[in-house]
Amino acid sequence: MANEKPQNYANHVRIDPMFHQVIFFLAAIAILLALWIVIRYFGLSSIELLLLSVTLMLLALRLRAYATKLQDRIIRLEERLRLQSLLTGPSRSRIAELTEGQLIALRFAGDAEVPALVDRALAEHLPMDDIKKAVVNWRADNFRV
């Protein structure tokens, strides 16, 4: 990670090559091949192969969704703890009003800009993307799945 370029709004999205380029690609090929076999050699075995291939693709997609959802839950917990230590007064009492997306986006904000950004997010009902765009001192998340 030392040789990675600094993370910012433009490059913060993570692509997992093993999933996005290998597993997904192989599952798609398996479905196409199974479809070809069903058309060419229709029978119970070919239908079973197609069902297995589709199941493999759905399983891969669900596993990815489960991993990111779990990580979102952990990020929400981390950010609530972080906000408890950074915010004071009325802002601190309004932490529960932040949406899941707002909490997840706030993880990229440096400690110094968090209080103002939280106040703005709550006052303007900022969506996740707008919060990320408003971050000046980007705090990288290099461990995102």
Task: For each feature predicted by the language model, list its residue ranges.
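Juxtamembrane regulatory segments of integral membrane proteins
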Residues: 105-108, 113-114, 121
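Positions in alpha-helical segments
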Residues: 56, 101-104, 116
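Membrane-targeting alpha-helical segments
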Residues: 3-69
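Charged/polar positions within long, soluble alpha-helices
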Residues: 37, 86, 108-111
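Short, surface-exposed polybasic-and-hydrophobic patches located at secondary-structure transitions
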Residues: 117-127
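A membrane-cytosol interface segment of integral membrane proteins
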Residues: 106, 127-145
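Membrane-cytosol interface motif
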Residues: 73-104
